[in-house]
Swiss-Prot record:
Oligomer and partners: Heterodimer of an 'A' and a 'B' chain linked by a disulfide bond.
Full protein name: Trypsin inhibitor B chain
Entry keyword annotation includes S-adenosyl-L-methionine: no
Keyword Disulfide bond carried by entry: yes
Function: Inhibits trypsin and alpha-chymotrypsin.
Amino acid sequence: KDDHCKDLGSIDDDE
């Protein structure tokens, strides 16, 4: 999981 993903408002385990 990437913490920066949640920064975009979308938490994707894939990205």
